[in-house]
Amino acid sequence: MEIVTVFGASGRMGQAQVRQLLLAGYQVRAITRKKGVFSDNNVTEVSADYNDPQSLDDALAGSDAAFYNKPSFEQVTKMIDFCAAVGAAAARADIRLIYQTAAYAPDEEIGQYNYDRVLATERALKQGGARTTIFRPVLFMDNTLTKW
């Protein structure tokens, strides 16, 4: 059975991803600070620290793919550093694909901070070298189906 690691698994997007991965028959490794969120036998809860490359390596070891739900910070340099750390760890783990859901942004910088920082985090994730897919929805559809 293929293993998919989900960063931020206990958050809104992460929980939806875990549910769909389980329905599709994957083994899920849930990176979360909240233990006990998942009761399914096909979910393994683990911790990882974005400041600790070894913990990221351990979290991704043996995974076939990963969903990266990046944390949000006011300090954009911290967010960029964390994206770079995850991208590098994914490459070291030989992950086939790392998938990130991001906010909408144009494909080129436009001099607008909120959009340009989205592109900066995407570049940081990709620079690790693992094959990366970025999805930029205008609206997270799960928000229309559940209370938030």
What are these regions (language model features)?
Residues A66, V86, L125:
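Hydrophobic/aromatic pocket-lining and membrane-interface residues
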Residues A48:
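Cofactor-binding loops of NAD(P)H-dependent oxidoreductases
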Residues M1-K34, F38-N41, N51-Q54, D58-A61, ...:
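Oxidoreductase cofactor-interface core, primarily capturing Rossmann-like NAD(P)-dependent enzymes
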Residues V76-F82:
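Glycine-rich anion/phosphate-binding loops
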Residues F82-A89:
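Short, conserved SAM-binding segment of the class I
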Residues A65-N69, Y99:
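Redox-cofactor binding/interface segments in oxidoreductases and associated redox assembly factors
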